[in-house]
């Protein structure tokens, strides 16, 4: 029948043209298409089940949720960058950009941002987290290792390693309802006004933490006005989470358990210092990271913190490879290369190499690795044996030759915390480190004789020396820690120097308060001078800044604990009110460019030490004396509390190594 059906053929200029369309594929083409689709399906399914997020989860639903959490942690800026505010882009003004409404934010963007924030809060509110005092096992998985530590990761304090046999918690007696050590800042029935002040500081911590989490999570610090990460901080752009590590023990002490847990989990999963390929300050990394991690280990017993502290300590060891054992200032954890600051020439800084002793000694005691103690003991020996001009220590020393640089001496910048750590090393050792105490008292007698000055109106201050002479009649804000230092020294002596130390402590703390009281913002400048024209006031523009510093509040806290004079609490509350009025912004807390302006401009940096130190000391001053008692705890220069050996069973010293010897030590022995 087909033979009689008509056929049709197209012709162009009489030439037949073949048809270019078919209604079906040839059999071979069908097989090829099916094969491609089948291969694609197999690859897709394989990828689905071998992604790290899916391998570490028990169910597909959990895996999807984990992926969602990863996106969430990236922060709202990933999905919706914040709008330009105040006609600014970054640090540079932009002319002619119009914004709607107050503050320069587009109302549509504000509505979208509020919806996103509400969604994040709703999702975070769904979490049910255990109190960290009872269980600090990680709640997130990591592709780098097991998702949970062994059951015995939480260690009870080894009372046998300490002279004291009593139950001691961060707040004093061990809570009856728990076999862990729980922090309680105020006893039941406390004064409602004091409780209100304590809660105010806690809310400040939450405001600082929440905005860091929202705009800079995992980065080092926050720009609270720009609402983005601060990439030019002391730790640069590397994702070390400096604010997280620095603020963790403050969260714990304030009882902010959910926030502590999320910070703890970030450290467990993301803090890998050996991946950082940039120069880090040995000093800053030690006091903030090693110090912060060891403090959390002492408070909680979570061995993750101890192990991370050892990891960071190991990364710093190559900086000590010098002819004298005095470390270089900077270390690249990835390449292991170390160097000095360009501005310091061949020299290391006294306050940096001399402010490692607490952290490295304690790290040796809790890990059983003696190498850390060996490094700082070598520094101590060099500084003890070297010739000291007038019994004081110049700020610069060459680690290759062991010779002093410029004969510039200070209890402020470049020198301050070296002297602080001589006293605190003796305190933390339970009085066993006699060398440190002798070095401290000898240096302080020289400092009081040569640096202590009194202004025409009677204000005491610590000036700076160069070649034995006063070079400037000024005092740094950094020196304001000295009031607390001299007070601690006074209460631990039983001789004629004790009374003099306490007298100096009161006078210096009063002077630092005057530098606050004489500014329009009631916050203190970076440095202040003394002359007939003006006293306790800054004169140069770069001295008029306030960087959210804690040193004055540290002295308020210690002076309150040791004297019980109400004015120290009153001064602290004045500072809280000033911080809330001038430094608080929608995106956190900012430093100030000029403390003498009634409406000062912000510097747009929320320093990590604002959470670690400033807020911690302001919180502690309104707490009970049994909350971190000073006869059982000593604070490192970043306000991380360390237990005192022989007086606090949370010291957790071990008799033998609990971690393998670091590779650097093995290589040096070879």
Curated annotation (Swiss-Prot):
The active site is at residue 526. It is an enzyme of class 3 (hydrolase). Strongly inhibited by 1-deoxymannojirimycin, an inhibitor of class I alpha-mannosidases, and by EDTA. EDTA inhibition is reversed by the addition of calcium, but not of magnesium. It catalyses: N(4)-(alpha-D-Man-(1->2)-alpha-D-Man-(1->2)-alpha-D-Man-(1->3)-[alpha-D-Man-(1->2)-alpha-D-Man-(1->3)-[alpha-D-Man-(1->2)-alpha-D-Man-(1->6)]-alpha-D-Man-(1->6)]-beta-D-Man-(1->4)-beta-D-GlcNAc-(1->4)-beta-D-GlcNAc)-L-asparaginyl-[protein] (N-glucan mannose isomer 9A1,2,3B1,2,3) + 4 H2O = N(4)-(alpha-D-Man-(1->3)-[alpha-D-Man-(1->3)-[alpha-D-Man-(1->6)]-alpha-D-Man-(1->6)]-beta-D-Man-(1->4)-beta-D-GlcNAc-(1->4)-beta-D-GlcNAc)-L-asparaginyl-[protein] (N-glucan mannose isomer 5A1,2) + 4 beta-D-mannose; N(4)-(alpha-D-Man-(1->2)-alpha-D-Man-(1->2)-alpha-D-Man-(1->3)-[alpha-D-Man-(1->3)-[alpha-D-Man-(1->2)-alpha-D-Man-(1->6)]-alpha-D-Man-(1->6)]-beta-D-Man-(1->4)-beta-D-GlcNAc-(1->4)-beta-D-GlcNAc)-L-asparaginyl-[protein] (N-glucan mannose isomer 8A1,2,3B1,3) + 3 H2O = N(4)-(alpha-D-Man-(1->3)-[alpha-D-Man-(1->3)-[alpha-D-Man-(1->6)]-alpha-D-Man-(1->6)]-beta-D-Man-(1->4)-beta-D-GlcNAc-(1->4)-beta-D-GlcNAc)-L-asparaginyl-[protein] (N-glucan mannose isomer 5A1,2) + 3 beta-D-mannose. InterPro entries: 6hp_glycosidase-like_sf, Glyco_hydro_47, Glycosyl_Hydrolase_47, Seven-hairpin_glycosidases. Its EC number is 3.2.1.113. Pathway: Protein modification; protein glycosylation. Its cofactor is Ca(2+). Residues 52-670 are lumenal. Disulfide bonds join 480-512. Involved in the maturation of Asn-linked oligosaccharides. Converts Man(9)GlcNAc(2) to Man(5)GlcNAc(2) primarily through the Man(7)GlcNAc(2) isomer C processing intermediate. This is Mannosyl-oligosaccharide alpha-1,2-mannosidase IA.
